[in-house]
Amino acid sequence: TDHVSPWALFDLMPHVYTVSSQFGFEALLAGCKVTCFGMPFYAGWGLTDDRVAKPARRSRTRTATELAAAVYLRYCRYFDAWFREPVDAATAIDQLAFLRRSYLSNATPVAGYRIARWKQRAVSAMLDGPAGPPIFHRSLDATLTDARTRRAAVAAWGMDAVKLRPRIEAEGISCMAIEDGFLRSVGLGAAFVQPASLVFDRQGLYFDPTRPSDVETILAEDSFTADELQRAASLRHRIVEARVTKYNITGNAVPLGLPAGRASVLVPGQVADDWAVLVGRPRSFPAGENVNAILLQRAKARHPAETVIFKPHPDVEQLGRAGALDEAWLQRHADVVARNTPIDHLLHIVGHVETYSSLAGFEALLRGIPVSVHGLPFYAGWGLTEDAADTPRRGRKRTLDELVAAALIRYPRYWDSISGLACPPEVALRRIAEARGGPRRKSGIVGVIMGRGVIMARRLLRSAKGIRR
């Protein structure tokens, strides 16, 4: 009565007895002897031991290969699991195999800790498996009790997981840190736009260089097959062709008035109090100083004869996060401030990127642009970037396609919010590219308003706490 795949039993059962079950057809394909006490579609062709008379119209003798060709290739029609478009049998089989692998890979139950309600749908879809979807809790005690009872892993968002990991693992419970993947959405997470990809890191997090992460371990230790690297190259080319980035914030490419015949350098701004900036900060970036100011000054000093373009981070510009620079100061240190120009447009016109740890550096690498790194992002230290900081754990040289295979194929999980199914990165890329080129959804506008409201509420709470002190 257990849930067991028939294919796991065929090696143990050389002979199958059935009335008309589909099990008998699959047993034939597996090479088993099949006795039928009914007359299913696969009986009467000389392949089965038939205990009832066959219809006169089944007069021909067929091979198992001919039977499979008739059933799978000529009789059935197939549709893409995510886009509902006609596909051939081989493609349908590959897609079903992917969905099966994704489902079975989640054999361990999961107890979710303090995961926001709007994120739970994506997390559930990516972690659903034989043990069922995650069970979400608000308190740590309830989470740990559930984990002990069901022998579950604990999943928590970002630095919540990093901070609690020692306590959780001290009890013999596995802990996963969740964060957005690198092909995320059309719009910001702060605007409650659902993610197309998430990472579930069992060691650290990709933006925390103080400890290993799963993606760092993949790059430091794993090997990649030729097929994986070919797939990575294809994925990279498609990303560049579709001009897809992490958030894909669209807008009109405002003319920047760049001097003709002069090379340009992009300096992407970051959120100054983001964990990606605060943890593992090199001594050359003193704590308490605006990372964007230091970075911009260095870029200008390193490229005095080039046009330095500063792109403020959208969360800083739109949602008031930390890291803003005084306008007069900006005018002195940046040749151009590209506030409303989409990052994908900038990556098509610059010849160099100077970054602290922005994902724009990774996106520039995908496009073949030289990148100088002043912090310790996951893509630094592998021989692909000019690194200002030491990366002692990352001594292995990697190719760009190996980096893509690790960061975009092996490390994240992907989810298609339209079908509700787990999906490979190619499907997520197509969804993002199509959404990026289509009209903005009304929910996106509502999300931006709600996102700004959340930021304002946080500010008010911080102010109130300061007054109470």
Which residues are covered by each model-predicted region?
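Catalytic-core helical/loop segments in enzymes performing group transfer/polymerization on anionic/lipid-linked
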Residues: T1-R469
